Amino acid sequence: MKIKVGINGYGTIGKRVAYAVTKQDDMELIGVTKTKPDFEAYRAKELGIPVYAASEEFLPRFEKAGFEVEGTLNDLLEKVDIIVDATPGGMGEKNKQLYEKAGVKAIFQGGEKAEVAQVSFVAQANYEAALGKDYVRVVSCNTTGLVRTLNAIKDYVDYVYAVMIRRAADPNDIKRGPINAIKPSVTIPSHHGPDVQTVIPINIETSAFVVPTTIMHVHSIMVELKKPLTREDVIDIFENTTRVLLFEKEKGFESTAQLIEFARDLHREWNNLYEIAVWKESINVKGNRLFYIQAVHQESDVIPENIDAIRAMFEIAEKWESIKKTNKSLGILK
């Protein structure tokens, strides 16, 4: 029997999760919600995806456009086993009462506070913690990126300091910036470090800057080691870590632009780069300090986590069975 999945919010994350659900043989996409009949809503309908209004207050927008919806979010909740909340940050907490009333499990995204869910989740780090849970939060794109690589070396970690160089907006976002400035997060630590600690118990401090780019985040990471680790050890660990890929400047990967072009060359949907990209040349060990630089595709790295979280919540697969299944279905390289 397939798990019936609904998506509340069919935007950057929602449409990617919806696509990923359709690639699973143990899940069924029942429908998605929209607040207005925009091009994404029309595209969903063209793909045969049932579209629902996010609430009754949005119905007039669809009626005015002659766009026929299947009902509202409440109607969708009656048909699903789980809802993936991909609404803007803060909305998930407000929506939770609807999910509770409907008796439906829910997955929230990283824009929500950790308290909204029973567990914060990154599949390879704490899959077991989500087993049987009703409410799970998939952490943000940046936090997912940090956890993927730091979890792989956590037995060696004494203290982490990471600088987050964040993209200003997603490619289709015309409302955010800056477009001609570098904007620091003047509160130290930034929220990313404490967010990592909701998944793995390590000592970490982070600072963050927003820069005028749309395609990826970059992290510069320094790790103080509590036991010896060589550069070759780290390379070997990362090469054997799922959803982490090593890229070399020598082979033309000089910036995030080439990383996204690589995803395009793979013919990935929306040029998704689900894997965290680590520059091999940046991996260096000086004394008891490890340095490396990684890039995160903010639109897609959390997508496989949503799929794995669904399986964990319904306890239909063990950790590595789910991860391997998700990886294969999405064409994740390792």
From Swiss-Prot:
Temperature dependence: Thermostable. Has a 44-minute half-life at 100 degrees Celsius.
Reactions catalysed, as given in the entry: D-glyceraldehyde 3-phosphate + phosphate + NADP(+) = (2R)-3-phospho-glyceroyl phosphate + NADPH + H(+); D-glyceraldehyde 3-phosphate + phosphate + NAD(+) = (2R)-3-phospho-glyceroyl phosphate + NADH + H(+)
Gene responsible for this protein: gap
Active-site residues (renumbered): 141
Family: Belongs to the glyceraldehyde-3-phosphate dehydrogenase family.
An MF annotation (GO) of this entry: glyceraldehyde-3-phosphate dehydrogenase (NADP+) (phosphorylating) activity
Provenance organism: Pyrococcus woesei
Compartment(s): Cytoplasm; Encapsulin nanocompartment
Protein's GO biological process: glycolytic process; lysine biosynthetic process via diaminopimelate
Subunit text: Homotetramer.
Keyword Transport: no
Functional pathway: Carbohydrate degradation; glycolysis; pyruvate from D-glyceraldehyde 3-phosphate: step 1/5
Activity: how regulated: Insensitive to pentalenolactone, an inhibitor of bacterial and eukaryotic GAPDH. Activity in vitro is significantly stabilized by potassium citrate.
EC number: 1.2.1.59
Function: Possible cargo protein of a type 4B encapsulin nanocompartment. Active in the presence of NAD and NADP, prefers NADP.
InterPro entries named among the record's database cross-references: DapB_N (IPR000846), GlycerAld/Erythrose_P_DH (IPR020831), GlycerAld_3-P_DH_AS (IPR020830), GlycerAld_3-P_DH_cat (IPR020829), GlycerAld_3-P_DH_NAD(P)-bd (IPR020828), Glyceraldehyde-3-P_DH_2_arc (IPR006436), NAD(P)-bd_dom_sf (IPR036291)
Residues binding D-glyceraldehyde 3-phosphate, per UniProt: 140-142, 192-193
Residues passing through the membrane, by range: none
Chain residues that bind NAD(+): 12-13, 111, 167, 298
Name of this chain's protein: Glyceraldehyde-3-phosphate dehydrogenase
Claim: NAD is one of the keywords in the record: yes
Keywords: Cytoplasm, Encapsulin nanocompartment, Glycolysis, NAD, NADP, Oxidoreductase
GO annotations of cellular component type: cytoplasm; encapsulin nanocompartment
Main subcellular location: cytoplasm
